[in-house]
Regions:
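Short, aromatic/basic amphipathic alpha-helical patches
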Residues: 22-34, 88-97, 117-124, 239-246, ...
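A nucleotide-sugar donor-handling region in carbohydrate enzymes
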Residues: 107-197
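Conserved catalytic-core segment of nucleotide-activated headgroup transferases in glycan assembly
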Residues: 176-186, 191-236
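Structural motif
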Residues: 76-79, 102, 195-196, 267-270
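Active-site and donor-binding regions of nucleotide-sugar-utilizing enzymes
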Residues: 1-136, 276-277
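Donor nucleotide-activated moiety binding/catalytic core segment of transferases
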Residues: 234-283
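Catalytic binding pocket for nucleotide-activated donors in carbohydrate/polymer assembly enzymes
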Residues: 276-342
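Short His-Asn-centered micro-motif
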Residues: 1, 14-17, 80-83, 106-107, ...
């Protein structure tokens, strides 16, 4: 967005420690030099605090913007994805200063289009407090939503009043863009020999297991472990090397960066429900094939409402992309044996 919509605008960017290696990315963004200020936010410990006393303290300290200093700029627009005590606190603080700020949201990958401003219990509590105080809730202050495919957002969310703003198409084959992404994420091209790349999730470690590791081992038996490499989710602690399956050593580099900056022609990208390669394949032709395999564990996923919703969302989004003549080589498989013919 800084290279397109906000190319000539003065922009600050805040990055939280929810992402692996965020502190290093902050330093590289400073080196990139296109932002006025690049700020690192330590928010993970606050958002995921366990003790009730800490949650209450954080709710009122951060949720009402007491952590923001008086020299904070009067921003014309704040753009964010997802609600937390930090975004609510910034909203409350700038409103208290009578700053006429426009509040906007943006997509976080193509599978986020069916979700409007996710937020936890703390945000709901702040919403209630703001209502009692007679103040507009932050989610009701949103005016715009930035995304690559406005038609998909309008299709998923017909009831909101947001102005849908298209993020301009971009030439991701441009050498300069690859150089910027490689700089910011400290990316060096990897010569992957394996034909099949599996993207794991963190479901086993987030309390919603459905047998993903067992699926990986079955795939290794079908295609050969020597032909399979694993791109692990940052929170996935499963060990695959004991089964002679190679794990990609990417040091926290998102797959999206790899696919945008590398040649993945001829590869077969496999996942239960990750949207990583779908998001990139929708905006850049890569000559790779992709398969979702959630139908094969649908009975185990059915007890989790979030997975039922996600599986339906994947089907809907993929059908719509196919109708747009995009992602024609990305399919939903109902049996693993079909991998041998892809």
């Amino acid at each position: 967005m800084k290279e397109t919509i906000f190319e000539k605008k003065c922009v600050d960017i805040w990055i939280s420690d929810h992402s692996v290696g965020a502190d290093k990315i902050v330093n590289r963004l400073k080196e990139y030099g296109r932002f006025r200020n690049v700020t690192f936010i330590s928010s993970r410990e606050v958002v995921y605090s366990k003790k009730t006393s800490d949650k209450v303290k954080n709710l009122f300290y951060y949720g009402f913007g007491h952590n923001y200093s008086s020299d904070l700029p009067d921003y014309d627009e704040v753009i964010f994805h997802g609600l937390s005590v930090f975004s609510c606190g910034l909203y409350f603080y700038l409103n208290k200063r009578n700053v006429n700020t426009k509040w906007s949201s943006y997509e976080e990958g193509i599978l986020s289009y069916d979700t409007d401003l996710p937020g936890g219990k703390s945000v709901k509590m702040l919403d209630a407090v703001f209502s009692i105080m007679g103040k507009k809730k932050i989610r009701n202050a949103i005016e715009q939503y930035y995304c690559v495919f406005p038609e998909l957002k309008r299709r998923s969310n017909k009831s909101n009043t947001w102005e849908i703003v298209k993020i301009p198409d971009f030439n991701y084959n441009n050498g300069r863009i690859r150089d910027i992404l490689a700089l910011v994420f400290d990316f060096a091209d990897m010569d992957i020999k394996q034909k099949y790349i599996f993207f794991t999730s963190s479901s086993d470690w987030d309390g919603r297991p459905y047998g993903e590791k067992e699926m990986v081992l079955k795939i290794a038996d079908i295609v050969g472990s020597e032909n399979l490499i694993i791109k692990k989710h940052p929170r996935d602690k499963n060990e695959y090397s004991l089964k002679n399956i190679t794990t990609m050593n990417s040091d926290g580099v998102p797959w999206e960066i790899f696919q945008l900056c590398s040649d993945v022609a001829g590869k077969v990208l496999i996942t239960v429900d990750s949207g990583s390669f779908l998001s990139v394949s929708a905006i850049k032709e890569s000559n790779a094939k992709g398969v979702f395999i959630f139908p094969m564990v649908q009975d185990k996923r059915a007890k989790y409402e979030c997975f039922v919703r996600r599986d339906k969302n994947i089907r809907d989004i993929l059908d719509h992309l196919h109708a747009m003549r995009k992602c024609q080589d990305i399919l939903i498989l109902s049996e693993l044996e079909s991998l041998k013919t892809i």
